[in-house]
């Protein structure tokens, strides 16, 4: 069965693919969006494909290496400037967060529900694994990451437990960490966990985001995408939690809306909008949620790059 990504139809509508255009899929994953773009491109069109995950790139090469319209590059979309010249793209798509294959394969170490090595790296050849990071850093740094990137209210309690645990034995497995977190979480008088989600959900999110520099890459990637889009080009971003969506929303607003001014201070320069918001944020409907429950937290935002000369007239 062909994988259909979250908010697929809305993403394709947002990109507004033209037959001879040039597009960038910055998060190839299983290739669902890439296939959708290629179905609409003619012989003169072009699709640039990127992904941090070498397994995703291997799939892209298996499926699309014989298609002359496709250029495949292993790496984060934060590096898209190395692949696309300024004002050369008609559309850019980022489908953020962890992919289904990464969650579903225990050996990748992303899931607290399946036992595997405590890795969490989207590119296993880059940087520290989650286990290496947890073994090295201070209690304070662990707590800060869980709080900042996982929005975990019990971050200090969990960090304290991790440091105490690692003093006696290493944390090397996903289920090992998940069970440790669950064992120290505050509970109600009846013994139930206070949260409706799994106790390790936010901690795993925070560690994963930190290990992969996800929010740093997102901020850099958005700026690079803006530079690479030609006037009229579309930016389409699908995010899966509030931290990602906040960055995307603020980025679009910063380049689309006149910033507030202080009437007591002189205006430094005239604001020139570079983006136009296209519609409101889009979420999955009930029909899609029945087929794909993981779509519940997805938010899609679309913006169009403006012609600077037109904008200042």
Curated annotation (Swiss-Prot):
Enzyme Commission number(s) of this protein: 2.1.1.199
Gene3D superfamilies registered for this protein in UniProt: Putative methyltransferase TM0872, insert domain, Vaccinia Virus protein VP39
Superkingdom classification of source: Bacteria
GO molecular function: rRNA (cytosine-N4-)-methyltransferase activity
Gene Ontology CC entries for this record: cytoplasm
Keywords, sorted A to Z: Cytoplasm, Methyltransferase, rRNA processing, S-adenosyl-L-methionine, Transferase
Listed GO biological process terms: rRNA base methylation
Reaction equation(s) it catalyzes: cytidine(1402) in 16S rRNA + S-adenosyl-L-methionine = N(4)-methylcytidine(1402) in 16S rRNA + S-adenosyl-L-homocysteine + H(+)
Positions annotated to bind S-adenosyl-L-methionine: 31-33, 51, 77, 95, 102
Signal peptide: none
Main location (coarse class): cytoplasm
Localization: Cytoplasm
InterPro entries: RsmH, SAM-dep_MeTrfase_MraW_recog, SAM-dependent_MTases_sf
Family of the protein in this entry: Belongs to the methyltransferase superfamily. RsmH family.
Matching NCBIfam families: 16S rRNA (cytosine(1402)-N(4))-methyltransferase RsmH (TIGR00006)
Function: Specifically methylates the N4 position of cytidine in position 1402 (C1402) of 16S rRNA.
Stated name of the protein: Ribosomal RNA small subunit methyltransferase H
Gene: rsmH
